[in-house]
């Protein structure tokens, strides 16, 4: 059977993570025992005569251990136990590298791009996406309005507006005359977005939210408090 493995240059991956200020000194693949199946699945596997593997490959990150600014040791951690932000960056970098290695003309879609990423790191990645070294097309979604003022052209920014029927409408900032009349560096799109210049701002009734919480407290709070005593 032909191997379905894909090659990723580990040295370059580690260098990229290091430049992104992540303390990962190496990446290793370990053979680890597979998780046991529950009784029902185990029975199905046996009835179908499926050869369930006893081991599986798992990715580990290696971190340097410091004491008084000196490296005294290193430790391994499964990628699955890394923080959400570290895993997020790892997957983004992996997608970028695979695209670079396979023609550098791919379209990569990343939902919730900034999830658990520091805003400076997210902005740096956007600059990389727009660099001359990158010929791939990235389509990203984000809730971080600070990225509106990152290294993006006006025609690259789209906002998703939802009406009272719950129907979403995708519109470009380029379509707003107010945005086109000024140079890219003369305007804060994030500030104007918060001012409602482009729409797509959620209408939140804070007083209504507080009223609901107060109503819950008055209706259930005292009764539950008595039951606990």
Feature-to-residue mapping (PLM):
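A short acidic (Asp/Glu
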Residues: 39-40, 120-121, 150-151
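Histidine-centered active-site/metal-ligand motif
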Residues: 63, 118, 143
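Walker B catalytic acidic pair
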Residues: 111-113
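Conserved D-loop-proximal element of ABC-family nucleotide-binding domains
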Residues: 115-119, 123
């Amino acid at each position: 059977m032909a191997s379905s493995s894909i090659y990723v240059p580990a040295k370059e991956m580690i260098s990229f993570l290091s430049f992104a200020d992540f303390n990962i000194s190496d990446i290793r693949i370990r053979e680890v025992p597979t998780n046991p199946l529950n009784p029902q699945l185990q029975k199905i596997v046996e009835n179908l005569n499926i050869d369930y593997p006893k081991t599986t490959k798992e990715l580990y990150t290696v971190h340097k251990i410091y004491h008084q600014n000196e490296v005294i040791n290193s430790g391994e951690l499964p990628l699955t136990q890394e923080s959400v932000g570290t895993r997020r960056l790892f997957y983004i970098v992996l997608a970028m590298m695979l695209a670079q290695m396979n023609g550098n003309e791919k379209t990569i879609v990343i939902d919730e791009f900034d999830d658990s990423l520091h805003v400076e790191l997210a902005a740096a990645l956007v600059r990389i996406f727009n660099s001359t070294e990158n010929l791939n097309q990235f389509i990203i979604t984000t809730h971080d309005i600070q990225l509106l003022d990152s290294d993006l052209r006006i025609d690259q920014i789209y906002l998703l507006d939802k009406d009272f029927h719950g129907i979403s409408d995708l519109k470009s900032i380029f379509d707003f005359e107010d945005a086109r009349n000024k140079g890219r560096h003369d305007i804060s799109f994030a500030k104007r977005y918060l001012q409602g210049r482009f729409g797509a701002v959620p209408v939140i009734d804070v007083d209504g939210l507080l009223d609901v919480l107060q109503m819950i407290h008055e209706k259930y709070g005292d009764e539950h408090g008595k039951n606990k005593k």
